[in-house]
């Protein structure tokens, strides 16, 4: 075998391992950039990126997604979704399982959810729309350090609700909008224990059996609770 043939043979035999080593680059699940993407033993989609957005069309067995800088979009996810970005928005079209989403700088939108939701934003608004008639436990925790929060639930959704709205400006312009019969109270004194003086508007109450725990917390933002 001459040198040219030997070189060609070496390239052909090493090609499969070279392609395997490129997994995560140009993945159909991502928008490019350096990433590590894989499918878990149970079929879940797992993507971790050092920078750039993530776009997953369908994750029927769950998804664990994270990026150090970029937005994350999921079309449809079942079972569970664990999503985190250090700088960008999170958008989920439809989730039938549990959702745990966190962003350090952006909004969170879940267009339709049929399970428990935990959504935390360090600097953006949150919008969640719970649908369906499932009797499973569907606790909801929504928290923003600076933005509006809007939660929509089915009209007969049983819940134990606690809402805390803090504002730091003397000319109060924020409010809790709800028609669920919650008790609403506003503090009279400025609380300086958190550094920046703030006042609180709180709302609480039980709707139906109170089966599902709903907690909503925001700073300098409105809270809207819809029942439909």
Predicted regions and their residues:
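Intrinsically disordered, low-complexity terminal regions
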Residues: 1-228
């Amino acid at each position: 075998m001459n040198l040219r043939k030997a070189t060609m043979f070496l390239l052909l035999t090493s090609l499969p391992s070279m392609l395997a080593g490129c997994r995560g680059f140009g993945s159909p699940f991502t928008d490019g950039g350096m990433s590590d993407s894989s499918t878990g033993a149970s079929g879940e989609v797992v993507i971790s990126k050092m920078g750039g957005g993530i776009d997953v069309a369908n994750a029927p067995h769950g998804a664990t997604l994270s990026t150090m800088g970029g937005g994350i979009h999921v079309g449809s996810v079942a079972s569970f979704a664990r999503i985190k970005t250090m700088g960008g928005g999170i958008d989920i079209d439809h989730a039938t399982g549990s959702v745990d989403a966190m962003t350090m700088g952006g909004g969170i939108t879940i267009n339709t959810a049929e399970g428990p939701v935990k959504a935390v934003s360090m600097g953006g608004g949150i919008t969640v729309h719970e649908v369906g008639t499932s009797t499973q436990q569907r606790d909801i925790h929504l928290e923003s350090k600076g933005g509006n929060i809007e939660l929509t639930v089915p009209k007969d959704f049983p819940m134990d609700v606690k809402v805390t709205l803090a504002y730091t400006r003397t000319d109060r312009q924020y409010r809790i909008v709800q028609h669920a019969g919650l008790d609403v109270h506003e503090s009279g004194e400025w609380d300086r224990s958190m550094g920046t003086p703030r006042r609180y508007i709180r709302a609480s109450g039980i709707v139906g059996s109170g089966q599902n725990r709903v907690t909503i917390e925001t700073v300098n933002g409105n809270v809207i609770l819809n029942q439909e």
